[in-house]
Amino acid sequence: MSTSANFRDNKPRLPRDERRALLLSAALEVFTVAGYHSAAMDEIADRAGVSKPVLYQHFPSKLDLYLAVLDLHIDSLVFEIQKAIASTPDNANRVRATVDAYFGFIESDGEAFRLLFESDMSVEPSVAERLDRMTYDCAAAVSAIISLDTGLPKEVAMLLGVGLIGSAQVTARHWLQRDSKLSRQQAVELVENLMWRGISGFPSK
């Protein structure tokens, strides 16, 4: 048995939840750098400081592990968007808070953002279903406010919600990829002004 394997085996056992979190963190790093298809379970286990059998005790396959990482960060982003919308009763401030939530997510967790929006697995049905659900859940939170405030039909409000969410996501992604000289605050203000000028054109009830 190798020295590294002996070291891993002699390490104190972490509680199951802590070990799972450690594995998910290591997997995110490897999947982001290598992509799903080139990522190796050996590398993920080594980065997490566990043996490969331990990794497989938690996640029976590489796809199971990938989906668990995806679910964790989808839930995190959806929560941040919902929290932003609920943070103020003022609609202009809601738009700003929602845009800022995307930029905040990408600034604090660029690896997770790349996993969600630049995945080489987006055509995999189980991945596509989760990404669609993420978009729907974020857009639904926005559209509920639009429908309530304007009286627009739910289908119309949902389309507008998808448009707002999509714009925030794409501009935040561009800001990250281009290493923009604009500060986060400047970028958020620009995108918020664009969105608010559009959505405020719909009269309130």
What are these regions (language model features)?
Residues 97, 104-140, 151-152, 159, ...:
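Short secondary-structure transition hinges
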Residues 22, 26, 30-64, 68:
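Helix-turn-helix
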Residues 75-78, 125-149, 158-162, 170, ...:
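Amphipathic alpha-helical packing segments from all-alpha helical-bundle domains
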